[in-house]
Every structure is written in structure tokens, then in C-alpha cells.
Regions:
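Extracellular beta-strand solenoids
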Residues: 84, 105, 120, 134, ...
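Extracellular beta-strand/beta-solenoid scaffold signature
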Residues: 96-106, 128-132, 149-158, 178-191, ...
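Acidic glycine-/aspartate-rich tracts in secreted/extracellular proteins
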Residues: 87-90, 123-124, 321
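Extracellular/periplasmic catalytic domains that process cell-envelope and extracellular macromolecules
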Residues: 29-32, 75-76, 110-111, 192-193, ...
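Extracellular beta-rich repeat passengers
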Residues: 1, 28, 36, 245, ...
Length: 379
């Protein structure tokens, strides 16, 4: 098994578990006592594991959702590696514990160490007609899968999670929702009220809404610490990601390719460091609510207050516009009051507190230059 690029906040030394490798060691080898379960369309209902469910009790569980639910008891200490072969559909599963998303991974309490990997084997592994919900969990890895026709979200990392690593997925359309902006499904990979997660090396094919970050309700003492790196946003529309109440989000080395609405969007007091990305024919590479490029039209962020972006070393071509606070772009003159992002000349540059959002008077957190913050990246 090759060792993947383990970087970003999921691997920060500041995080609770310091890894998101699930059933694997950080060198890419399987943990010695890991249980490996092979799942195909024919075995998803019948795959068996004897799970420790109480201090002096084990339970024989049949079916992939039943096994994962038994892990929620919090008594099983062995890592579990679920390996999916070929295409597994919702109808192939024994059942689903999330009526809105599909397969559910849930810990007993907030931030429970699951030591769980869900991965595809080979180049054609696919889950179809359902997604995966992760809640109350930590040290969970999801990788090497195609995700097709998912129910609500493709991957939903929702509430009290940390050290979650989602990588090397191919994500296609989801099932159409009831809202006008859900024709391609809802979120491809959404992260809500969760910390120290890395979303990396994923390919989003023509997605409608790639990724929401939402720490609602807003809490001035809460930080998300999320990383998005080496993703390919391939003719997807928006939310790459859309960051609401999101504190300390690192977005780097992503490829934005023909995006019809916008790249990175920040609202509600968020701070994002956007560096070394390529924006090619992305309409508005970076946007903050109610100012800059967003203020030119009707607004795309539901009139939420603005957020702050520090931009550094990005390559932009074919955009409709970019407004920097402190420097002219090739598209427009600088505007210190109504801007999309602050343009840093050096990576170590701090954004002065005099630069604030028009709505909400938010300043940039400067988390990326704080020596006490380990972003999980070696520069």
C-alpha cells in the first residue's frame, strides 16, 4: 500500500489525534491488529464481523451498516478497514442509518476515535445512490471511491468530528433536490461543526455545490482548522468551498477549471488563506459577501455578512473580475473598502487590522502566520 500525501489540518500536531489515517499507520501500512472487511454488491448484506459491544460481550454482526453501528458502542479497539470492490448500490446494503445521506459512521460521543477507513479497491470501486454521513467521529479516512447519484450530500462531515481525511474520490452528480440550486444534488463534500479535517486529491465532475463549510451557530472561540488541497474542481459551479462562520481555512494547490459562478466564497466572519491555486476560466475566483465582485450583482450569499481572504501566489486567467484590497489586479483597480481578497506579496505577510469587511467589520485572523498554529504542511 502506497503512502499518500498526509498533510493538512487532519495531521496537525495541534489536533486531538494528530492523524486521520483511520485503520492505517501514517507510513501507509495497515495497523497490525486491523480487521479488514471486503465488501461487494453480493456481500454488503452478509459480510460478518464479531464486534466487542460491552466490557464482557461481543456481538456477531452481519451487513456493513450493522457492523458500523456496532462500532458506535465504543468498546471495539481494533481498527477497521472496509474495502469496497466494484459498484455497491443503496439496494445492496443491509440498511442505512441515515435516511437523508445513506451510510452512517457515528461515534458514541463527540470526537470518538473510530480508527476507521472506508476505501475502494482498484480503479472501479464505486458507491451509488447513497452517500456517507460522519458524526461524533475522529480518525476516519474515506478514499479511492467514485460517488454517484448520492442522496443529499456525497460526503457529509456533520457535527463533533475531528481528524477526518477525505481524499482521492471522484464525485459526480447527486440526486436532484427540491430547491432550484439542487438540480445536481446538494453538497458534494460538506463540513459542518467539525475540526481538523483535510479534503484532498478529489476530482469533482461538473458538481453544482462542491463544498459547504458551516460552523453555525457562530462562536468567536471556535476554530475549524480545515484544509483543501490538490483538488480538481472540474467545471463545477460553486462552493469550492463556501465558508460560513469558518475560522482558519487553508485552501492551496487546487485547480479551478471552468467554474461558472465562483471559486472560494467567504461569509459571516470567516478567514481563509488561499494560496498557490490555479484559477482557469473561473468566473470569480474569490468572493466575500456583499462587497467586491459580489456587490456587482444581486449577491450570491443570502445577504450574510462578509468574510476575509488572504490571497498569495495564485495563478488567475479568464476570470470576470478580481478586486484586491491593496493592489491592482489585471482586471480591476484596488479597492480598500470593497474587495474580494487581500493580496499578500510574501507568504509571511500579515493582513493589517485596518482591512475590514463592509458588512460585519471582520478582520483577517492571520492564523497562517501564527507560529503556535500547526497547519500540517511543511513549507
Amino acid at each position: 500500500v502506497a503512502s499518500h500525501d498526509r498533510s493538512g489540518f487532519a495531521f496537525s500536531s495541534d489536533s486531538k489525534y494528530k492523524t486521520g489515517s483511520g485503520a492505517y499507520n501514517d507510513d501507509g501500512t495497515l495497523k497490525q491488529d486491523a480487521v479488514v472487511l471486503y465488501v461487494t454488491k453480493d456481500t454488503a448484506k452478509t459480510v460478518t464481523m464479531t464486534v466487542k459491544t460491552d466490557t464482557n460481550k461481543t456481538t456477531k454482526c452481519d451487513g456493513i451498516q450493522n457492523i458500523i453501528d456496532a462500532l458506535q458502542k465504543g468498546k471495539e479497539t481494533r481498527p477497521v478497514d472496509i474495502r469496497i470492490i466494484g459498484t455497491v448500490t443503496k439496494n445492496d446494503l443491509d440498511r442505512i442509518s441515515s435516511s437523508s445521506e445513506g451510510l452512517q459512521v457515528k461515534g458514541k460521543n463527540a470526537y470518538s476515535d473510530m480508527k476507521l477507513t472506508i476505501e475502494g479497491v482498484g480503479s472501479d470501486a464505486c458507491i451509488k445512490d447513497f452517500g456517507i454521513l460522519v458524526r461524533n467521529a475522529a480518525n476516519v479516512e474515506i478514499r479511492n471511491l467514485s460517488v454517484l447519484n448520492f442522496m443529499d450530500d456525497g460526503i457529509s462531515i456533520d457535527t463533533s468530528n475531528c481528524n477526518i481525511w477525505v481524499h482521492n474520490l471522484d464525485i459526480y452528480y447527486g440526486q436532484a433536490g427540491s430547491d432550484s440550486d439542487q438540480k445536481k444534488g446538494d453538497g458534494s463534500i460538506d463540513v459542518k461543526k467539525s475540526q481538523y479535517c483535510t479534503i484532498s486529491y478529489n476530482h469533482f465532475f461538473d458538481s453544482g455545490k462542491c463544498g459547504l463549510v458551516d460552523a453555525t451557530p457562530a462562536d468567536s472561540g471556535y476554530s475549524d482548522y480545515l484544509t483543501y488541497h490538490h483538488n480538481w474542481f472540474d467545471h463545477s459551479d460553486s462552493r469550492h468551498p463556501r465558508i460560513r462562520n469558518g475560522h482558519n481555512i487553508h485552501v492551496y494547490n487546487n485547480y479551478y477549471d471552468g467554474n461558472s459562478k465562483y471559486g472560494v466564497g467567504v461569509t459571516s466572519g470567516s478567514s481563509a488563506f488561499v494560496e498557490a491555486n490555479v484559477f482557469e476560466n473561473c468566473k470569480y475566483p474569490m468572493m466575500s459577501s456583499l462587497q467586491g465582485s459580489d456587490a456587482k450583482g444581486k449577491g450570491v450569499f443570502s445577504n450574510e455578512k462578509g468574510g476575509m481572504i488572504k490571497a498569495y501566489n495564485n495563478i488567475i486567467s479568464g476570470a470576470a473580475g478580481v478586486v484586491y484590497a491593496n493592489a491592482d489586479s489585471s482586471y480591476e483597480a484596488a479597492n480598500a473598502a470593497s474587495f474580494d481578497a487581500y493580496l499578500a506579496a510574501e507568504r509571511s505577510e500579515q493582513v493589517a487590522g485596518s482591512y475590514k469587511t463592509l458588512s460585519g467589520s471582520t478582520t483577517y485572523s492571520n492564523f497562517d502566520t501564527d507560529v503556535s498554529v500547526d497547519m500540517g504542511v511543511t513549507e
